[in-house]
Amino acid sequence: MGVAYIFYNTGIRRRTDMKVGFIGGGNMASAMIGGMIQKGVVSADDILVSVRTEKSVERLTNQFGVQATTENEAVVAGSDLVFLAVKPNQIKNIINLVKNFISPEKIIVSILPGKSLQWLGTEIGKPTKLIRTMPNTPALVGEGMTGVCANDLVTEEELQLVLTLLKSFGRAEVVPEYLM
């Protein structure tokens, strides 16, 4: 499948053939989703979010017009790129639930503090395209600064795509993982 890019007057390009998933729909995920939609990087129709409660499903659907569910597996299965946006103490159980749905071409992006690329790779248990990010709280108002690092399976084009998504709610820079 080819990749089509559309350039908007914001200077951000949009990949039109991609589904973006979020496991977790709290404050940071909501800031990211809002920025991506507002900047036109991803349409609401192309965003899938899994959350723990039906109340959160309703909130995200009403607030952003995204597809929301309580099924983490459905988000991973239906997305090309998945943001892990949950609390660090929840991630091990979530990975165990969804790892069978992670295929070699999927990109997994973590916003979890304290969980290295190596740790994530070990938990998933198979070669996976992994990107680790560290967004900060000004992202909640579109002024964030996000540190980014990736494993060797992520191509330069894929890394640039993720940087484009992250820049929709502030700035993003590639840094060595030890600085994160």
What is the predicted function of each stretch?
Residues 54, 63-64, 72-77, 81-148:
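Rossmann-like NAD(P)(H) cofactor-binding subdomain of soluble oxidoreductases
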Residues 18, 45, 66, 106, ...:
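A structural micro-motif
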Residues 20-22, 82, 109, 162:
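Hydrophobic packing within well-folded, soluble alpha/beta domains
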